[in-house]
């Protein structure tokens, strides 16, 4: 038996040589796979329903990014818990570059929001690796065209006259709409009632359908309804007026320091190989500077704000520090 095993396995030196060769082939194969990346379709996970800011950004990017990568880019909506379910899916995905998150600004506060609510966070931000920021928009405060309020001052006066009687739709607890409205409410010393829906698209439909009195939305989400005369913009949450809404004042002009921007950016799972990340970053850079993408952004009224990974990481970290304070101030929601 010993002789037979010896013949099969060879000498210890031969066995070591075989094992070393196998390891080398494995390492070479992995390196080759990274060099050839991508060899199959890439999925952009949108953690919100269709029709919202993350969905619009993802669908504008998909085709030009596919052209840059020479591979199919799919857009998959995975909504739930204000975007946390989709973000967690990407955070826990295989770090091979084929599963990418199109996140909104709420991605940096969702873990803290879960803790404030007494629940375990579905993911932590260090489980995601920044690729690029694509856009950063102020929110537009909206009412229906038949609303009695024609200015932000009208709405705030009504809220002060009858505290707790004005409701608004949101994309979910601690999401961009919720945070932007509560920041203004705090500054104006008013009480507004949040009615959470499962995303920016459903939130907009709730306002149009008369289920709520007001909401806020990214310009791209609101533009068509404003143009059609169905919605009236009262104010914007940015530092300056929007080019597409030059007659609509900012919160700051009305005397309220409640600046808020909803941004959209791409993340990969932490642990994605550097070579793969570099390919993703370079291809995104090429895609977002293509005429197809820039014209699409302009048509939708989205403010293009491209930042590569290092700048995006710094931007998101600073925004997260600021917005986590807002989450803690709001506190647990019953």
Predicted features along the sequence, with ranges:
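N-terminal signal peptide c-region/cleavage motif recognized by signal peptidases
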Residues: 26-30
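N-terminal (or domain-start) structured segment
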Residues: 33-127, 165, 173, 189-214, ...
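Bacterial N-terminal signal peptides that target proteins for export
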Residues: 2-19
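Short beta-strand->loop
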Residues: 126-133, 191-196, 213, 223-259, ...
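Hinge/capping helix and adjacent helix->loop/strand transition within the periplasmic-binding protein
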Residues: 65, 92-98, 113-202, 251, ...
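A ligand-binding cleft/hinge motif common to bilobed small-molecule-binding domains
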Residues: 106-117, 178, 182-187, 214-246
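An extracytoplasmic/periplasmic, membrane-proximal ligand-sensing/linker region
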Residues: 39-41, 186-190, 250, 274-334
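Beta->alpha turn/N-cap motifs
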Residues: 102-107, 170, 199-200, 217-222, ...
């Amino acid at each position: 038996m010993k002789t037979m095993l010896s013949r099969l396995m060879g000498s210890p030196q031969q066995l070591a040589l075989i094992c070393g060769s196998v390891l080398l082939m494995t390492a070479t194969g992995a390196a080759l796979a990274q060099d050839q990346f991508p060899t199959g379709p890439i999925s952009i996970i949108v953690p919100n329903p269709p029709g919202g800011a993350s969905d619009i950004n993802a669908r504008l990017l998909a085709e030009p990014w596919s052209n840059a990568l020479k591979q199919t880019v799919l857009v998959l909506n995975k909504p739930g818990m204000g975007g946390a379910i989709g973000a967690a899916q990407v955070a826990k995905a295989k770090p091979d570059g084929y599963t990418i998150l199109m996140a909104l600004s709420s991605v940096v506060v969702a873990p803290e929001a879960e803790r404030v609510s007494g629940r375990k966070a579905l993911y932590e931000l260090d489980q995601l690796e920044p690729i690029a920021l694509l856009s950063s928009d102020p929110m537009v405060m909206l009412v229906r065209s038949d609303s009695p309020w024609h200015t932000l001052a009208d709405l705030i006066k009504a809220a002060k006259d009858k505290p707790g009687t004005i409701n608004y739709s949101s994309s979910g607890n601690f999401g961009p709409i919720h945070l932007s409205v509560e920041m203004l409410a705090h500054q104006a010393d008013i009480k507004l009632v949040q009615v959470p829906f499962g995303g920016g698209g459903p939130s907009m439909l709730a306002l149009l359908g008369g289920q709520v009195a007001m909401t806020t939305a990214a310009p791209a989400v609101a533009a068509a309804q404003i143009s059609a005369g169905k919605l009236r913009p009262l104010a914007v949450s940015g530092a300056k007026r929007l080019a597409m809404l030059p007659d609509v004042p900012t919160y700051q002009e009305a005397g309220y320091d409640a600046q808020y921007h909803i941004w959209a950016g791409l993340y990969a799972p932490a642990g994605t190989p550097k070579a793969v990340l570099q390919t993703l970053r370079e291809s995104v850079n090429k895609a977002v500077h293509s005429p197809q993408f820039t014209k699409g952004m302009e048509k939708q009224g989205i403010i293009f704000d491209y930042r590569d990974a290092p700048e995006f990481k710094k931007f998101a970290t600073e925004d997260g520090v600021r917005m986590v304070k807002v989450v803690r101030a709001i506190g647990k929601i019953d």
